[in-house]
Amino acid sequence: MEKQRLTAQLSSLRVPLFSVPWPGQCSNKAEVIEARMMKWADEHNLLVTDEYRNRVIRTRYGLLAARCYPNAGEELLQAIADCLVWFFLADDLFVDRVEVATDETIRNLTAMVDVLDLNVAGSPPVFGELAWLDVCQRLRRLLQAEAFERFAQGMRLWATTAALQILNHLRPTSVGMREYQTIRRHTSGMNPCTSLADAANKGSVQACEFYDADVQTLVRQTNNIVCWANDIQSLRIEIHQPGQFRNMVTIYAQQGQSLQDAVETTATRVNKEIASFCELADAVTARPISDELHGLIDGLKYWIRGYLDWVVHDTLRYADQFIESDADDRRF
């Protein structure tokens, strides 16, 4: 009933565009990185059918990496691109585009955590586990130990808060906005992504700067901007998913707003968060801070602008013409 009410309002839905006051960047290695990423995904058996391969080709995850980490060294950028294609596919096939919970859900998610904790794959490995192990071992080699642990902790929280997201979808109605924002902050995968922003620019930030309250606020604002914008941009396809579909927009609609009004309310929050991010970023960079921290803040800006540009210019992940074929992965 909830999905039917929302679906009935989709045909007239207007999706806003977002802008930020800094230019976009893109690595000049983008196409090479994309091609290698596809080859890597094929070698690790992530592209389960020709249909699925074609979907990944038009989604352009390598371009997302190139836009969000434009200054990264080629080896690190390749590892990040491979990580992104793995993450999107694992998130779709383990959580989002399948049944809310399956017999394999716990095994799949705990296997991902075990790779981080134990640095080995299980026997037999679950889908994507060997690819994930390969990505993690490359990042362990390329990053300082503490920097890798920031990434790893973000991924552990993705796997564990996925369970909270599943619980929310087993309820007849969604949890409230505060609880949703907590879940979204971690199931998005943004924290491990932003944890790589410093290494991809001027090197890893020392812990005393990385965990500064204002810096962590900037990281959280970056997460919010990307996640809440995505809640609007992915709305049409997510409503058709068999598993996860509740997000900020649908919660506002659950509270009584029309779907269009819920989109506008969410967009207003995105724009306010962008303004707050800009104000705080200017204040932090006006202080005497390290080059590495300057690089991290630049990296957060690259992520915000890079994601927004990827949606507008590169990817067909959320395109209307592929909703019918892409929203439901149970056949895979």
UniProtKB/Swiss-Prot annotation:
Keywords: Lyase, Magnesium, Metal-binding. Binds 3 Mg(2+) ions per subunit. Mg(2+) 2 binds at residue 96. Substrate binds at residue 184. It is an enzyme of class 4 (lyase). It catalyses: (2E,6E)-farnesyl diphosphate + H2O = (+)-corvol ether B + diphosphate; (2E,6E)-farnesyl diphosphate + H2O = (+)-corvol ether A + diphosphate. The Asp-Asp-Xaa-Xaa-Xaa-Asp (DDXXXD) motif is important for the catalytic activity, presumably through binding to Mg(2+). Terpene synthase that catalyzes the conversion of (2E,6E)-farnesyl diphosphate (FPP) into sesquiterpenes which are important for fungi-environment interactions. Produces a mixture consisting of 8 sesquiterpenes including corvol ethers A and B, as well as traces of epizonarene, gamma-cadinene, delta-cadinene, alpha-cadinene, alpha-cadinol, and an unidentified sesquiterpene. The major product is corvol ether B. This is Sesquiterpene synthase MBR_10393. It comes from Metarhizium brunneum (strain ARSEF 3297).
